[in-house]
From Swiss-Prot:
Taxonomic superkingdom: Bacteria
EC number of the protein: 3.1.15.-
Family: Belongs to the oligoribonuclease family.
Name listed for the protein in its UniProt record: Oligoribonuclease
UniProt-annotated catalytic positions: 130
Organism classification: Bacteria, Pseudomonadati, Pseudomonadota, Gammaproteobacteria, Pasteurellales
Membrane-crossing segments per the record: none
UniProt keyword list: Cytoplasm, Exonuclease, Hydrolase, Nuclease
Gene: orn
Length: 184
């Protein structure tokens, strides 16, 4: 049972064929909704976008290796979903939990994801509040102010969108307790 709430947070992660939205495309989108205290309320659909073999063959060696090992390239080839279909399915899920414009975009390095959303999924980009809740900001502050903390939180780095979101939420919980020193 969904619960529409202005305080709920939308976590998103994209996997792309590269880092340049002028040349690269989105290949996977996942979302999770948490309450304000970072408790997971719902996991959205993990959606794979079909892209051409030509585009996939132009990916960097790192992308080809990573997305072959995690199975994403094969799922992209098998998918029948367009970027627009993925965008609409994601928005339909989010509407159950968070009103449009209420939640900042949450995750790690979300400015990069937002660049791709503006280019290829503008309605989804517009669903978010203009603010960002970027876990990588705390990571950068910890790197400068408390570097010994960085090795205390280990990520698996599967480069699968849903796994990455779960890790981002856990990472923010870690920083909340050990860096910001707020107990929940």
């Amino acid at each position: 049972m969904s619960k529409l709430d202005n305080q709920n947070l939308i976590w998103i992660d994209l996997e792309m064929t590269g880092l340049d939205p002028e040349k690269e495309r989105i290949i996977e989108v996942a979302t999770i909704v948490t309450d304000k205290d970072l408790n997971i309320l719902a996991e959205g659909p993990v959606l794979t976008v079909h892209q051409s073999n030509d585009l996939l063959n132009k990916m960097s060696d790192w992308c080809i290796k990573t997305h072959t090992e995690n199975g994403l390239i094969e799922r992209v080839k098998q998918s029948k979903l367009t970027e627009r279909a993925v965008e609409l399915q994601t928005i339909d899920f989010l509407k159950q939990w968070v009103p449009k414009g209420a939640s900042p975009i949450c995750g790690n390095s979300v400015a990069q994801d937002k660049r791709f959303l503006y280019k290829y999924m503008p309605d989804l980009a517009d669903y978010f509040h203009y603010r960002h809740l970027d876990v990588s900001t705390l990571k950068e502050l910890a790197r400068r102010w408390k570097p010994d903390m960085l090795n205390a939180f280990n990520k698996k780095n599967t480069h699968l969108a849903l796994d990455d979101i779960r890790e981002s939420i856990e990472e923010l919980k870690f920083y909340r307790t050990h860096f910001i020193n707020l107990e929940k």
